[in-house]
Structures are given as structure tokens and as C-alpha cells.
């Protein structure tokens, strides 16, 4: 497993990380704890060093799970996210200083860590970031040696830009072949500020694996049932043809491999956060990710032209 620097934080992380939202059962069907443990243990065995979670995943249960499984692995880098008041009905976003401090202490206890490696604000609004109160709390915790680095997990170009201008050192964003706008629009700022990028949704929730029929149906408790309309999904599946020429049968053996290698080919990405729900899926992803060069310059350039043409015709 190759490692990359996490921006200017001084932290090195495996270029493939384990995301735990899918393991928590949120957005999908529940997963037995034994299956969760198996994926975490397999990730460790394969050299994964970054584990991404949030205090809201499984209502805190996923943090506790990682705390148990990683207790004997202090070298593992844990990323957690704060900012969801799960005691409210319904749950709501909350970023006032008192709540952030209390949430941090609860996460620290569940994770069994005196020092948490990376803490991110979890989908804060533009106004929350602009006020800077929540970020100031995390900076105080970093100054006190309670966390090693902090940042934000955000949606959208404008919010990401505000976060960067606020001086955050770590940014988590969705990034894949069909969702690259944030990274493309903010490339200069990210590079100039040396921001560490954690890329999630790298396979677009399974779409980029290329294994769905046009009439794919999702269970009612699967978040993807509300993510796309039938027409949207059929259009997206047809657009996979833009990626298929990257599959060469030797180094790039599947559409899934091509999509993952597209993300890893971007040197701004510190870590591609995977979301497997089984050890088998994790094995496949890590095997197919390969090593640098992930896609040849010619293949990558031609792919980007095809993707740009898709956006132009949308």
C-alpha cells in the first residue's frame, strides 16, 4: 500500500482508506458486527492506515467499533466528523462551540484515543464556516495537542472555497469521474494552500462499477433509491461508455478499476476513501487500484475529453 502526504499536516496516509458509513448500516441495510469487524481487520492486513468515520454513523456505534478494533493499532490514522445533534428530533446540524467541545470528548471516549488524528466539521453551512467559531474550537484543541489536524467535509464548490479561505488543512469532498467539479474549480487554491484532500464517493455509490442493468431497483432502506430517478439512473448508466475505453484487459481490468484509477491519478488526492461492505469488495478494490501510473497520460487525457464532452451535452 502506497502512502501520500496529507497536505501540509505532516501526516502520511495510505492512498486508499476505509470509509465506515456503509459499514454502519446508515443508508443501507444493517450489517452484523462480525462483518464490520472482518472488513476493518482485512483493511489493516492489506496496509490501510486511514479510517474515516463520524459521530453520527450508527449514532456513534461506528466510532466505538473502530475504537475497539484499532486499540492495538495506534499507528492507524482516524478521521472523524462532528456537527450532528443526534439527540434532537429530528437530528439536526449544530456547530456552536459548546456542542463541538462536548462532541469531541464523546468521540474521543468512543474511539479510545487521547489524541484524535483528524477532526472534520461535518457538512457545515457557508455561514457556519464564515463565522469561524467551530473552526476556532478545533484549532484550540489542536494547539492543546488533543488533535493533530482539522478541517471540513463539505458539499459544493462555494462551501469548499470558503473552507479553504478559512485556512483549513484537510478537506473531504465527493470526487469521481462523474463528480469532479469541486476539484477542478479549486485546483489552484488547493495546490497553493497545500490542502490535504480526502476523496469520498469515488465509485459514485456503486454506479461506476458498471454492473447495474438499466432497470436497476434499490430497496426502500437503500439511500440510492432516492438519489436518482429512473431516467437519471438510465442516463448515468449509458454515460459509463465514456470510461469503458480505459479498460485494457491487462493493467486496467474493469470499469471499477478505471474509475478508481481516475481518482488516484490526481496528485491532489491524499486518500481515496473506499466504502466496501464486505472483505471481498475491499480485496477487489485494493487489487484493482494497482500502482502509479494508474492510467497512462494518453488514456487519462482522452478520458478527460470524453467526460468534458458529457458535461457539455448535459
In which residue ranges do the predicted regions lie?
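Active-site mouth loops of central-metabolism enzymes
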Residues: 21-34, 86-101, 127
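A short, structured active-site edge motif that brings together acidic residues
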Residues: 75-88, 119
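Hydrophobic residues in well-ordered beta-strands that form the structural core
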Residues: 52-53, 66, 80, 152, ...
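Beta/alpha (TIM)-barrel catalytic core signal, keyed to glycine-rich beta->alpha loops juxtaposed to Asp/Glu
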Residues: 3, 124-312
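Short, well-ordered coil/turn segments that N-cap beta-strands
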Residues: 11-16, 47-50, 72-76, 113-117, ...
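Active-site groove signature of glycoside hydrolases
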Residues: 108-127
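N-terminal binding-site loop/beta-alpha segment at the start of enzyme catalytic domains
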Residues: 1-77
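Short, acidic/polar
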Residues: 30-43, 95-111, 154-162
